[in-house]
Amino acid sequence: MEVNILAFIATALFILVPTSFLLIIYVKTVSQNN
């Protein structure tokens, strides 16, 4: 089974970018509430 590196990177970015974006918004919201 051959793994396509570009497909793997694209999938990783597609998952990590929105997750990190939501995480940053969450942290900012929590810090503002305090």
Curated annotation (Swiss-Prot):
Partners and quaternary state?
PSII is composed of 1 copy each of membrane proteins PsbA, PsbB, PsbC, PsbD, PsbE, PsbF, PsbH, PsbI, PsbJ, PsbK, PsbL, PsbM, PsbT, PsbX, PsbY, PsbZ, Psb30/Ycf12, at least 3 peripheral proteins of the oxygen-evolving complex and a large number of cofactors. It forms dimeric complexes.
* Family per similarity comment: Belongs to the PsbM family.
Pfam families tied to this protein: PsbM
Q: Can the keyword Thylakoid be found in this entry's annotation?
A: yes
Taxon lineage: Eukaryota, Viridiplantae, Streptophyta, Embryophyta, Tracheophyta
Entry keyword set? Chloroplast, Membrane, Photosynthesis, Photosystem II, Plastid, Reaction center, Thylakoid, Transmembrane, Transmembrane helix
Question: Which domain of life does the UniProt lineage start with?
Answer: Eukaryota
Q: Which example biological process does GO assign this protein?
A: photosynthesis, light reaction
Tell me the name of the encoding gene: psbM
The record's GO CC annotations read: chloroplast thylakoid membrane; photosystem II
Q: What name does the UniProt record give this protein?
A: Photosystem II reaction center protein M
Instruction: Say what the protein does.
Output: One of the components of the core complex of photosystem II (PSII). PSII is a light-driven water:plastoquinone oxidoreductase that uses light energy to abstract electrons from H(2)O, generating O(2) and a proton gradient subsequently used for ATP formation. It consists of a core antenna complex that captures photons, and an electron transfer chain that converts photonic excitation into a charge separation. This subunit is found at the monomer-monomer interface.
What is the originating organism of this protein? Triticum aestivum
Q: Mind telling me which residue stretches traverse the membrane in this protein?
A: 5-25
Q: Chief location of this protein? A: plastid
Q: Where in the cell is it found?
A: Plastid, Chloroplast thylakoid membrane
The record's InterPro entries line, in alphabetical order, gives: PSII_PsbM, PSII_PsbM_sf
Q: Does the keyword Repressor apply?
A: no
Membrane topology qualifier: Single-pass membrane protein
